[in-house]
Amino acid sequence: MKTFVLHIFIFAFVAFASASRDSAKKIGSQYDNFETCITEHGLTEDDIFSIGEVSSGNHKTNHEDTELHKNGCVIQCMLEKDGLMSGADYDEEKMREDYIKETGAQPGDQRIEALNACMHETKDMEDKCDKSLVLVACVLAAEAVLADSSEAA
């Protein structure tokens, strides 16, 4: 069974690194629990943000707060089903392990540093849905910046 980056990468999370190249793809759609989680939250695939929309930050300006929250709940659902979150709490070590497996990142890789920074940035958020979306958005944005800087080099 596939697990998160995006899981952010999904982590989504955070393991969305490979998927982040396909900006039209729906966030988390490549993971086994995607359909289950959107159904559990009464959404359809059309309701879910695209990877490009989240990595660029456009999801924050193009959508209402309720849409943001619902998308975050779907992400949190996938993270929880993959054992990466329990409620609003991350399993940071498992999150890193899964991210490394998904992305092939090695110790010292800037993507791992970005994941750590994003987990630190969101660790005190209490709402599990908002926390999940902010985490994944942070990781995807960092991956986009790192990809742009490596392409420019």
UniProtKB/Swiss-Prot annotation:
Mutagenesis / variant outcome for changing residue 134 to I: In allele B4, allele B5 and allele B6
GO CC annotation terms, alphabetical: extracellular space
Signal peptide interval: 1-19
Annotated compartments: Secreted
Consequence of changing residue 152 to G: In allele B4, allele B5 and allele B6
Covalent S-S links between cysteines: 37-77, 73-129, 118-138
GO molecular function: pheromone binding
CDD domains to which the protein is assigned, alphabetical: PBP_GOBP
Swiss-Prot/TrEMBL GO biological process terms: response to pheromone; social behavior
Secreted keyword on record: yes
Keywords noted in UniProt: Behavior, Disulfide bond, Pheromone response, Pheromone-binding, Secreted, Signal, Transport
Pfam families: PBP_GOBP (PF01395)
Statement: the UniProt record of this protein carries the keyword Signal: yes
Domain of life: Eukaryota
Transmembrane segments: none
Subunit structure: Homodimer.
Purpose: Colony queen number, a major feature of social organization, is associated with worker genotype for Gp-9. Colonies are headed by either a single reproductive queen (monogyne form) or multiple queens (polygyne form). Differences in worker Gp-9 genotypes between social forms may cause differences in workers' abilities to recognize queens and regulate their numbers.
Family: Belongs to the PBP/GOBP family.
Name of the featured protein: Pheromone-binding protein Gp-9
Organism expressing this protein natively: Solenopsis geminata (Tropical fire ant)
Gene responsible for this protein: Gp-9
